[in-house]
Amino acid sequence: MLVDPITRSDLSIFHAEEKFSVFNRLNFTRTDGGREELRQLFERPLSDRLQIEQRQQFLSHLSGVLDQWPNRISNGTLHVVEKWLEYPLDPIAENTASLSNLLYRWLHPADYSMIRYSLPHLIDLVQGCNQILGLLQSFRSEHPLQPELLRMERVLKKSELKQLVSADRSTRTSLLTSLQWARITRYAAKESLHELLNLYYLMDAWYSMARATQELKLTFPIFRETETPYFQANQLTHIQLEEPVGYDLQLNQQHRLLFLTGANMAGKSTLIKSIGIAVYLAHLGMG
């Protein structure tokens, strides 16, 4: 779908005052990074029918597991992980039982405190993503070419992260185990964790789209291959109205003209925008 900035502005997909934007109405993300990913998805509506229908299928499947979505990954969790990956940590010896490591807690107290604080959040990220993969297991088997899910699965299967996948968050780790995991996450698995962060932000955006579809009771549209333009909607409403009145509309070769009349503020512009927003959301793969 090709859309210019003026049309996007006329539909209030985005707005300088967030409360007036369609994006804000549909934003159910839990993280700052997820919000940015969702915004990028909204800026790039799809044009290919197959891609749209695949996203519809994915969001439909996701809607069925929203209540099981892990809560352990919060916005704060991801901020801690991001800070950890960039933190100027003093070196940790490769030999876990070296003297410098045994004395690390006393020689580098600030860094050791950062390690102790960050590790639970790293575990939450890794194990939370592993839970998400479990929730989407059936979708992955039915659609093996879903690239983002395959990337997440590949990252979590890497040997460096396996210890975090199986770690017990409630058990306090020893000094040497903490240093071992700190070294792994800062060196061997650093790029993997960056990739996992970005993948989770995308998952958060998808979660938001599925949650919005469910919460606002949106209906996935059906696309048909026709030689002429065609549009039909039953009980179409404007997504931002609290108590909307639905309209049945049909535009095709037999019904080529929609004539609107009425007093000022009767809702003519709102109805026109409703049609535009419905078409826009349809090309995002939403209802």
Across the structure, where does each feature detected by a protein language model lie?
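Alpha-helical coupling/stalk and coiled-coil linker elements that connect catalytic or binding modules
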Residues: 1-266, 270-287
